[in-house]
């Protein structure tokens, strides 16, 4: 018989830098997970993606065992890295802070494709372009 999922915990943690300190420790402690076991396994799995923020979904079972799935970094993080800026615009409709090319958008869409609810690469690119516009980025050909 399959184990019953008791709780789902969603976190965004810097790759390779999970520690028992907040916010990771308290979130996992409330779920009753072995915090050190999770942090070691997460850091080992994400060591090759240093510098990125990795969303993770942790499934906690009734017997307090757990499994977790790492997702691709958020589109906003990938766009900021591609544009070389620290943060997006506070007023995206008035102030444009950076420019990204369609080639960069396509590369980000291909990276995000497994996690996006898109039928093809063109619709995924439109989603990423929308995120870029809402951050105050200009998309150029």
UniProtKB/Swiss-Prot annotation:
GO terms for biological process: translation. One of its GO terms (molecular function) is large ribosomal subunit rRNA binding. One or more lysine residues are methylated. Pfam families: Ribosomal_L11, Ribosomal_L11_N. GO terms for cellular component: cytosolic large ribosomal subunit. CDD domains: Ribosomal_L11. InterPro entries: Ribosomal_uL11, Ribosomal_uL11_bac-typ, Ribosomal_uL11_C, Ribosomal_uL11_C_sf, Ribosomal_uL11_CS, Ribosomal_uL11_N, Ribosomal_uL11_N_sf. Keywords: Methylation, Ribonucleoprotein, Ribosomal protein, RNA-binding, rRNA-binding. The keyword rRNA-binding applies. The keyword Cytoplasm does not apply. Forms part of the ribosomal stalk which helps the ribosome interact with GTP-bound translation factors. Part of the ribosomal stalk of the 50S ribosomal subunit. Interacts with L10 and the large rRNA to form the base of the stalk. L10 forms an elongated spine to which L12 dimers bind in a sequential fashion forming a multimeric L10(L12)X complex. Belongs to the universal ribosomal protein uL11 family. This is Large ribosomal subunit protein uL11. The lineage of its organism: Bacteria, Bacillati, Bacillota, Bacilli, Lactobacillales.
């Amino acid at each position: 018989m399959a184990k019953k999922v008791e709780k789902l915990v969603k976190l965004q943690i810097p790759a390779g830098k999970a520690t028992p300190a907040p916010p990771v420790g308290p979130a996992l402690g409330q779920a009753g997970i072995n915090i050190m076991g999770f942090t070691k396994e997460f850091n080992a799995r994400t060591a090759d993606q240093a510098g990125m923020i990795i969303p993770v979904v942790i499934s906690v079972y009734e017997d307090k065992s757990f499994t977790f799935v790492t997702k691709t970094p958020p589109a906003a993080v990938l766009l900021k890295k591609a544009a070389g800026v620290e943060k997006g615009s506070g007023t995206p409709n008035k102030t444009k802070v950076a420019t990204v090319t369609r080639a960069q958008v396509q590369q980000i869409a291909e990276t995000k494709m497994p996690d996006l609810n898109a039928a093809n690469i063109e619709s995924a690119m439109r989603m990423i372009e929308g995120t870029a516009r809402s951050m105050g980025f200009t998309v150029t050909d």
